[in-house]
């Protein structure tokens, strides 16, 4: 999968499925499920590393997890999902040279094919322009931007007419600067529809209604593994309860010296 494939998907009206991955196991599961894009999101700071926000994760950690995701893929390279890696907080807000070095390192030292940046401030737009001119594919991200949590919080964004027009202008600017796709997070569905119609690049939504060109979800949220679910990303299964019950069953079997309840005794059970 290449960035240009997503544009063809939009032209054909084929919805784009994006899942997050943070290690080889989550990557293998998402690939087997048929995801078009695997996003190594800085949400791994919360999902995998136990932080309260995405801010603490470092570039080295993002690289480490991206390499692990790449190792989890099993299909031929041409058939693999597109790997997109978030540039973490302060890896691109402190100057174009630093941003190019960070993005270049992710692409050189892992199998990532693109990076994602949040926001459309003039400094970020300049970075996007520079990265694209250097041959680095960029995915944009507007609406709720978790790296700005201390300024904007986790509330719904662009809820009034002025902010909606501003976001639409920002989206058009990101396309003009060369972004190959755009994530819209936690914004009104009507606004997302307007953005989708205004852009030729794919618009990937999360909490932005059903009229986007695709959807992105944090895999752990979909599987119900997180203790607190985002209101715009309901779980499909109660994975947390399933896992706890399974592990609790094994603990009880071990303590009671009882065989597995399904009757199967594996070599691991015998050792």
From Swiss-Prot:
Signal peptide from the UniProt entry: none
Please state what the protein is called: 3-methyl-2-oxobutanoate hydroxymethyltransferase
Q: What organism is the protein native to?
A: Synechococcus sp. (strain CC9605)
UniProt cross-references to InterPro entries, sorted A to Z: Pantoate_hydroxy_MeTrfase (IPR003700), Pyrv/PenolPyrv_kinase-like_dom (IPR015813), Pyrv_kinase-like_dom_sf (IPR040442)
Record's function text: Catalyzes the reversible reaction in which hydroxymethyl group from 5,10-methylenetetrahydrofolate is transferred onto alpha-ketoisovalerate to form ketopantoate.
Record text on subunit structure and interactions = Homodecamer; pentamer of dimers.
User: Which compartment or compartments is the protein found in?
Assistant: Cytoplasm
Instruction: Output the CDD domains linked to this UniProt entry.
Output: KPHMT-like
User: Which E.C. number(s) belong to this protein?
Assistant: 2.1.2.11
Q: Which GO terms describe its biological process?
A: pantothenate biosynthetic process
Question: What Gene3D superfamilies does the annotation carry?
Answer: Phosphoenolpyruvate-binding domains
Q: In which pathway does it act?
A: Cofactor biosynthesis; (R)-pantothenate biosynthesis; (R)-pantoate from 3-methyl-2-oxobutanoate: step 1/2
Show the SUPFAM superfamilies listed in the entry. Phosphoenolpyruvate/pyruvate domain
Q: Give me the gene this protein comes from.
A: panB
Q: Which cofactor does it need?
A: Mg(2+)
Keyword vocabulary terms for this entry: Cytoplasm, Magnesium, Metal-binding, Pantothenate biosynthesis, Transferase
Cellular component, GO annotation: cytoplasm
Using the UniProt record, give the first listed, main subcellular location: cytoplasm
Which residues does UniProt mark as catalytic? 185
| Recorded family membership | Belongs to the PanB family.
| Residues at which Mg(2+) binds | 42, 86, 118
Residues that bind 3-methyl-2-oxobutanoate: 42-43, 86, 116
């Amino acid at each position: 999968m290449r960035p240009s494939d997503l544009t063809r998907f939009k032209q054909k009206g084929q919805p784009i499925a994006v899942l997050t991955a943070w290690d080889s196991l989550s990557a293998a599961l998402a690939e087997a499920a048929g995801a078009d894009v695997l996003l190594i999101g800085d949400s791994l700071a919360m999902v995998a590393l136990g932080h309260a926000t995405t801010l603490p994760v470092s570039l080295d950690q993002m690289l480490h997890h991206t390499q692990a995701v790449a190792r989890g893929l099993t299909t031929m390279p041409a058939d693999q999902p597109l790997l997109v890696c978030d540039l973490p907080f302060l890896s691109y807000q402190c100057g174009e040279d630093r941003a190019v070095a960070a993005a270049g390192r992710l692409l050189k030292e892992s199998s990532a094919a693109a990076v994602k940046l949040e926001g459309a401030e003039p400094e970020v737009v300049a970075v996007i322009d520079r990265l694209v001119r250097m041959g680095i594919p960029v995915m944009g991200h507007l609406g709720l931007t978790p790296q700005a949590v201390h300024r904007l919080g986790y509330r719904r964004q662009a809820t009034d007419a002025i902010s909606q027009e501003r976001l639409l202008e920002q989206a058009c600017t990101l396309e003009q600067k060369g972004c190959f796709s755009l994530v819209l997070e936690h914004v009104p569905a009507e606004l997302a529809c307007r953005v989708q119609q205004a852009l030729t690049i794919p618009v990937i939504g999360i909490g932005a209604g059903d009229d986007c060109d695709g959807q992105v979800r944090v895999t752990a949220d979909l599987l119900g593994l997180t203790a607190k679910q985002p209101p715009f990303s309901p779980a499909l299964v109660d994975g947390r309860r399933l896992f706890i019950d399974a592990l609790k069953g094994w603990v009880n079997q071990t303590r009671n010296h009882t065989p597995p309840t399904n009757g199967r005794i594996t070599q691991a059970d015998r050792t």
